[in-house]
Amino acid sequence: MGITHKDSFENRKRHNIAEDKAEQYYNSIDCRLIRYGLDQMNSGISKKEFCLIPQVLRNTPDYIVIQKMAWLVEVKGGRDILRLKFEDLDSYDKWTHFCPILFFVYSTSFQEHKQIPYGRIKELIYRHDYPSGRYPDNNKEYYKIPMEDIFKDSEG
């Protein structure tokens, strides 16, 4: 069945197929890809140390992509549902003051990716009033965004 949102953080992050797909995609086009955000699993930072870092810095987008302009890129993956934590959205709102944010979303059900500007993600959330859930390991609340909505969105 694979990894799900019910698995521990350590298991969820052990192998991130969405980041693999993002790197493959950006390395195949004419752009510069720079790893930017903190990767707790590969940084050597303990969970205790990681929690001492201010939230907005912990939630730094994963990459900078430079083509005709610079974008901060947040990579997200899932099967049928994209889960976006409420607190992460607060941080992304702050990051947009410095650089536009683009989401690279990979669905294992669709077996494809879509790039969608952060503003479109927020519009989808507000337009559809998606239900929320909580991660069992940390009780953090998240929106449940159907991948179908992301992949059929023509403006993203």
Regions found by a protein language model. Name each.
Residues I3-R12, R35-M69:
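Active-site metal-binding core of divalent-cation-utilizing nuclease and nuclease-like domains
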Residues I34-R35, L72-E74, L102-Y106:
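A structural signal for short, well-ordered beta-strand segments and their strand-loop junctions
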Residues M1-Q24, I29:
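A short, highly charged nucleic-acid-interacting micro-segment common to nuclease
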Residues Y26, P61-R79:
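Conserved catalytic cores of phosphodiester-cleaving nucleases, focusing on short active-site segments
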Residues R79-L89:
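Active-site-adjacent loop/helix micro-motif of nuclease/hydrolase catalytic cores
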Residues M41-N42, D80, Q111:
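Positions that flank functional sites
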Residues Q115-G156:
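Intrinsically disordered, low-complexity terminal regions enriched in charged/polar residues
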Residues D93-L124:
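Nucleic-acid nuclease catalytic cores
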